[in-house]
Amino acid sequence: MCIFDTIFLVIIMDKITIFLIRHSEQLKINTLLNNSENSQIANEKIILSVEGEKKAEALSKIKELSNLNSIWSSNYVRALATAKYIAERNNLSIQISTDLNERKIGNLDSLSKLRDKFTHTFTTEQLLDENLKNKDGENRFEVNRRMTSFINKLLAEYTGSKIAIVSHGASIKFLLMNWCSLNENFELFYKNKVLKIDSPSVIKLEFNKNSLLNLSQIY
């Protein structure tokens, strides 16, 4: 084996691909809970809609989500319900981390008062101000810190692997701010390409050790 073959082999072995997946379409429900703890529990238990189940199953069939080494999910029901189809097709067990949980919104009464002062949605306002925080909730900085810490653990432990992680809209956007910018419409973009974090969607992150090589939307 020549030196160039050796270098190429090392690069391949160090390469890690992470598929960052937003859960599928959730069931639309109304809640009258204003207590921060109760509303958080209710949010964690929201299931997928009938259409969301169909979309999650269709998502699992895309070619790039085959031959995975590991699949991770938040502990929210809708994330696990999305992950189950991918896990089944790859014959994997779902591993759970609360680091992948959605941004905690906090007290709904307090949020309602905050929204009266907003020009944009709460998530957009947080994208513009990493320290903006509702009572009993999380700001962008806090969510980014736990999401980034989780990604760094994967990069350290899963060299040469393909990993899927199922998370949530705000948390994914806050993580992507590590590499992306906002355009005039407050949309995330990377290398002039706009990213649509829909339910569901897949962002492919390719790393060599801790360095991002490429970021692209594949679904």
Which residues does each PLM region occupy?
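Active-site-proximal alpha-helix that buttresses catalytic centers in soluble enzyme cores
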Residues: K15-Q95
